[in-house]
């Protein structure tokens, strides 16, 4: 599959369900709804990335796909591991986006100063990485105080298309739904094994259910070997 197969949504009572993509609605139809919803429910996208990803094969396509959307109010790019010259190049790179955007330069003097002040109050993240990047991006989103819904996703998804973004927003933006969060998932294959949420939340439970229903079989046993099995905490 080239797009997320499903998403998990939840509401305030911690009830969760999986919404599978059966392809019954086109991307254009979903985006048409989102554009209508955006008039009263502004949407903001967070893109945490490394500068090196600008030179990879995934992010240029992601930017191109996002540039085709019309429902986003604002985009926050969290830029990590970039010097001043690279930050300027990043600004030119993300100008391809059609929506208004801001770049949070995490290695810049302003962010370093803020990080230092927050550390004195024991409020800053202790470890460098994507978590810290997202933490500051969310802080910027809260400070802007314009978005009704915020989505974020990685910048290394090689099979990305704009349907993924539309499906992330749709369950939480649609006023007829009561969902407060949504997680998309899609196959991640490495070392001849399927990884990620699609293995943990879809394939593994499916194989377990089949095993309980029809009993042990060589086919199911072999299928397990092609998964990165979840830990007890994941299950």
Spell out what each predicted region is.
Residues 147-156:
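Short beta-strand-to-loop acidic/aromatic patch adjacent to the donor-nucleotide binding site
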Residues 1-15, 228-231:
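Short, small-residue-biased leader/transition segments that mark boundaries at the very start
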Residues 180-196:
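Short beta-strand-to-loop element that shapes/binds the nucleotide-sugar donor at the catalytic cleft/hinge
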Residues 12, 16-64:
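N-proximal low-complexity "stem/linker" segments adjacent to membrane-targeting elements
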Residues 79-90, 99, 108-110:
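A conserved acidic beta->alpha catalytic loop
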Residues 162-181:
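Conserved donor-nucleotide/metal-binding helix-loop-beta segment in metal-dependent transferases, i.e.
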Residues 42-43, 67-77, 100-101:
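Short loop->beta transition adjacent to catalytic acidic/histidine clusters or analogous donor-positioning motifs
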